[in-house]
Amino acid sequence: MTIPELPKDLIEEILCYVPATYLKRLRSTCKGWNRLFKDDRRFAKKHYDKAAKQFLPLMSTNEELCAMSVNLHGTIPSLEVKDKPWLFVSDSKHCDIEISRIFHSGGLLLCFSRDGEISIIVWNPLTSETRLIRTRNRRDKGRNFVLGYYQEDKKTYYKILSFYLDSKDFEIFEFNSDSWRFIDDICPGLSLLYSDQCVSLKGNTYMFAIDDLSVSLLKYDFSTETSVPVPLPYKSRSFEAISLSVVREEKLSVLLQRDKSSKTEIWVTNVIDETTTKVMVVSWSKVLSLDLSPDLKIRYGESFLLDEEKKVIMIFNNRMEEENKSEDKLYIIGDDDNKATQVYTIHGYGPAVFNYFPSLVQIEQSSRQEEKS
């Protein structure tokens, strides 16, 4: 008895709910599915909207990008770093680029190097698609980049924002036109802080800024190319420690320590009102209040991840072990006893941890010259 084939539309509808990492395994089983997963922007958008999000904790340094497996179920938390790091050596076009920083937005990674002339690569690790972004011949020292996106007419458009901390020099890169253009000051009356403390949530970039009165949080909207202030849980002229993270692509999380004698607090957003164009309406809840050992001094911009349900954070901490020699140690800290468990030591420069969610999203190529990854 011949089994009837299911209608194509029904098959696509079923596949839209299958997590992205499982779809990758199915690519080799059928040429039609391979084309659907790899080349069909319509299906990629539909899958992005409907499929359950997977979150893969990643650790990056200037040398490699590794997946991690975190175990919080035992009496002592543990972490396993996958043996095989994700490197660009599998792509001969970009194997000579040493990555110094990675920024995640909407399933894509923006990777750039500050060694000599700046190189930028936008990369989808799931599909292996890449695009090399060329920068204009300008001052490279101190230049920073973030990736963001917005939706219009049921399509998703990505842009790159370029900025410096020491000047009011801002540019936008348009993927479709393959070109850079100058834009107006995105933070009038403010100065941006901590270039490595920017995060992307739902396409918008959040970053710290400061004026004469207090430290602020800004949301940069790539659709309007403007920013609005986001009130922090409380105001302060300065903080002993401050850092920013994203919780499961749904909430912002901020680490605050007012002064040396204060507890280290982790807050998350309950509500973010996206409709305002002046000052965002935000409510915060305090998830953790940690009384840490003086030996574990949290500094500005330490990269961290929060497990809101288990009330646990994973955070990097740079420590001087010997004269002129430092190590970055990764700790897991819980609310039950404030105990910090060291789970990993790394020697690479500028380590960071973040949650990556695999996606079939395709990298928009230039309309003037179609590039092949």
Curated annotation (Swiss-Prot):
It holds the Pfam family F-box. Gene3D superfamilies: 1.20.1280.50. Kelch repeats lie at residues 101-148, 149-200, 329-373. Keywords: Kelch repeat, Repeat. CDD domains: F-box_AtFBW1-like. InterPro entries: F-box-assoc_dom_typ1, F-box-assoc_interact_dom, F-box-like_dom_sf, F-box_dom, Gal_Oxase/kelch_b-propeller, SCF_F-box_component. NCBIfam families: F_box_assoc_1 (TIGR01640). This is Putative F-box/kelch-repeat protein At3g19410. It comes from Arabidopsis thaliana (Mouse-ear cress).
